[in-house]
Amino acid sequence: TKSQQPAAVVNSIDLNASYSSVKWRSIGPLRGGRSVTASGVVGDISTYYMGTTGGGVWKTDDMGNTWRNISDGYFTTGSVGAIAVSESEPNTVYVGMGEHAVRGVMTHHGDGVYKSTDAGKTWKKLGLEQTQHISRIVIHPRDPNIVYVAAQGALYGKTPERGVYKSVDGGTTWKKVLYVDDKSGCVELSMDYNNPQVLYAAMNEYGRLPWKVISGGSGSGLYKSNDAGATWEKIQNGLPKELGKMAVAVSRSNSEKVYALVESDSDKEQGGLFVSENAGKNWTRVNDDHR
């Protein structure tokens, strides 16, 4: 019989060569300062929202060719920390105020959460004014009324208004579902969109003093909930003992795979990119660059 021919081998693409002629260019907007948050719209490749640290929320409908401010006249401060667009109802947009990237020079703190149900044409304030700096907003993929807010809290002092807040009525009322102490806020929140009952929250003891920036302490840690925020378990097997700011993301294609970018004691070189292959039970460092 005729021997079977081997399958064709697809040559790998040299991405550097493919994009060597592409040049970066600014697409604006030219007012507002730094940006620490942006969000697209599922199913719409042309529409994006961007939050700036001094100029409020901006929107593009044409892939970034033009931008327009959509928060002027509604917001009482221009410092935006988080934007989230509902996957099941794209006209529903939540915005958390107060930039979350702690640095030597910070803009004004935020004043809570705003919501739009008409894709940014109008806005309503939903409370949580004392959280001051919001780092992430997560919306249930099938119910826009279930929403979680990661609140870092005040930068310059101790306050209890920090942690993870949850609403089941579209932001009309809020319940604090994760709290560590009055110095530690939630810097990152990630949901398993294949099972929205599962959440990961990164808590960080942080603050700003006249002579230094604080990031990391006894209140820092990575937490997981399997019951939509009702209870939480601290997970740390394989992670550095000393934790600072963290970023966390659950793989959409595999809920068992979770990534964590961890700041740790830089002198000991313990930080970096960690991955879990069993939904947070164990962690392995795969890269020592934590930038």
Residues of each region from the PLM?
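Beta-propeller blade termini and top-face loops
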Residues: 2-291
